[in-house]
C-alpha cells in the first residue's frame, strides 16, 4: 500500500508554491534600485544616458517659472526622451540655495532649492557643477547646492569640499559595464581664488585629466569613460586649436567620449579614432533669445558591453523651453 504523504511534506509543498506570490505582493527581494534603472530598458543590455547643455534657473528662466512653473520648462518630447533613458546629466548653470554670499563677478545667478524636485521628476538624475557659475553664491552656497541636489534625489558632479573630492571621477553605472564620468571646468574663475583645500569646483588641468583617464583605463580595459568639459569661447561656433589638441590627447589615453559646454552655441562636432567629441552642445533651459543661442543639441549614449552608439539630437529653445526637432 502506498503511504500517504506526511503533513510536513504537504506544508513544504504549499510554502514553495505560495512563496513567489507572497514575494510579489510584499516587495521582499526588491533591491530598491530606482525602477527607472531596473525595468525592461536593461533587458536589451543597453544603458542609455542623455547629456544636456546649460540649465539656468535665474534671470529670464526665473521669470518664466514665476509665470508658469518649473514643470512647464519640459516639453513633451524632452519628457519622453528623459523618461526612456536610464540617466540624464545636465549642466546646472547656477547655484541652487537660499544662501546669498557676496561675490565679485559680472553675471551672478541663483535658483531656488524648491525647484529641484521638479527636475528629478522630469527625469534628470545628475547635475554637473564644474562650471563658472556654481560659485555665484560663494563656497557656502556651493556646498549647500550639493546638499540640496542630494535632497532632491539627484547626484552632483564636479564639486566638493576640496579639489581632490571635486575632481574625483563618478561611477554612474556598473551595468552593462562600468561607466565613469570625469568633469572639469577648463576656465579661470572670475575673482575667485584657487584654494584647493576649500570647497570648490573641479578645475583639473589636461595633464591631471589624462592621469584620471589612464588610471581608470588601467584598472578596467572595458569601462566607458565620459568627459564633461566646461570650456572654450562663448558665442563662437568653432573649437579653438588648443581644445582640439586637448581633446585628442584625452582620447589617445583612453577617453571614450567628450561632451563640452559653456559656449552657449552649437560648436564643432568631430570623430577622432572612432570616438565622439562634442566641443559645445549649447544651451538647454536658458533665456538667451538670439538664433545662435537657441539652436543646440542633446547627446544620447547607448552603451552595451562592447560598444556605444552615439546619437545627436538637435533642439530649439523657445522662451526658455527646449523642444526636440521633429
Residue ranges and their predicted role:
Residues 18-44:
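Bacterial Sec-dependent signal peptides at the C-terminal "C-region" and cleavage site
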Residues 32-35, 42-46, 56-59, 63, ...:
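A short C-terminal boundary segment appended to hydrolase-like catalytic domains
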Residues 35-130, 136-138:
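N-terminal catalytic scaffold of extracellular/periplasmic and nuclease hydrolases
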Residues 58-60, 96-99, 132-146, 163-168, ...:
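Active-site environment of divalent metal-dependent phosphoester hydrolases
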Residues 62-76, 109-110, 173-225, 322-326:
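Binuclear metal-dependent hydrolase catalytic cores centered on His/Asp/Glu-rich metal-binding motifs
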Residues 85-98, 131, 213-238:
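Short acidic, glycine-rich surface-loop motifs adjacent to enzyme active sites
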Residues 99-120, 223-256:
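Active-site-proximal segments of metal-dependent phosphoesterases and phosphodiesterases across multiple
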Residues 123-126, 239-297:
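Conserved beta-sheet core of the metallophosphoesterase superfamily
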Amino acid at each position: 500500500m502506498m503511504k500517504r504523504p506526511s503533513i510536513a511534506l504537504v506544508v513544504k509543498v504549499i510554502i514553495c508554491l505560495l512563496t513567489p506570490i507572497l514575494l510579489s505582493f510584499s516587495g521582499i527581494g526588491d533591491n530598491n534600485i530606482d525602477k527607472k534603472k531596473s525595468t525592461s530598458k536593461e533587458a536589451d543590455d543597453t544603458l542609455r544616458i542623455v547629456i544636456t547643455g546649460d540649465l539656468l534657473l535665474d534671470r529670464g528662466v526665473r521669470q518664466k517659472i514665476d509665470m508658469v512653473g518649473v514643470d512647464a520648462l519640459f516639453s513633451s518630447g524632452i519628457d519622453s526622451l528623459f523618461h526612456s533613458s536610464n540617466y540624464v546629466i545636465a549642466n546646472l548653470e547656477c547655484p541652487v540655495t537660499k544662501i546669498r554670499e557676496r561675490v565679485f563677478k559680472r553675471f551672478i545667478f541663483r535658483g531656488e532649492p524648491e525647484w529641484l524636485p521638479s527636475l528629478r521628476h522630469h527625469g534628470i538624475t545628475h547635475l554637473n557643477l564644474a562650471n563658472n557659475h556654481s560659485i555665484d553664491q560663494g563656497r557656502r552656497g556651493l556646498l549647500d547646492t550639493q546638499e540640496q541636489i542630494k535632497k532632491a534625489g539627484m547626484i552632483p558632479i564636479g564639486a566638493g569640499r576640496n579639489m581632490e573630492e571635486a575632481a574625483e571621477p563618478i561611477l554612474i553605472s556598473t551595468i552593462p559595464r562600468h561607466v565613469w564620468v570625469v568633469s572639469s571646468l577648463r576656465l579661470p574663475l572670475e575673482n575667485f581664488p584657487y584654494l584647493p583645500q576649500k570647497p570648490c569646483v573641479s578645475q583639473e588641468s589636461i595633464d591631471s585629466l589624462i592621469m584620471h583617464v589612464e588610471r581608470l583605463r588601467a584598472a578596467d580595459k572595458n569601462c566607458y569613460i565620459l568627459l564633461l568639459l566646461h570650456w572654450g569661447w562663448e558665442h563662437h561656433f568653432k573649437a579653438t586649436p588648443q581644445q582640439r589638441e586637448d581633446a585628442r590627447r584625452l582620447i589617445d589615453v583612453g577617453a571614450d567620449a567628450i561632451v563640452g559646454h559653456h559656449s552657449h552655441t552649437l560648436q564643432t562636432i568631430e570623430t577622432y579614432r572612432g570616438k565622439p567629441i562634442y566641443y559645445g552642445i549649447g544651451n538647454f533651459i536658458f533665456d538667451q533669445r538670439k538664433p545662435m543661442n537657441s539652436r543646440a543639441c542633446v547627446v544620447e549614449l547607448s552603451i552595451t558591453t562592447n560598444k556605444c552608439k552615439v546619437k545627436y539630437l538637435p533642439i530649439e529653445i523657445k522662451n526658455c523651453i527646449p523642444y526636440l526637432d521633429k
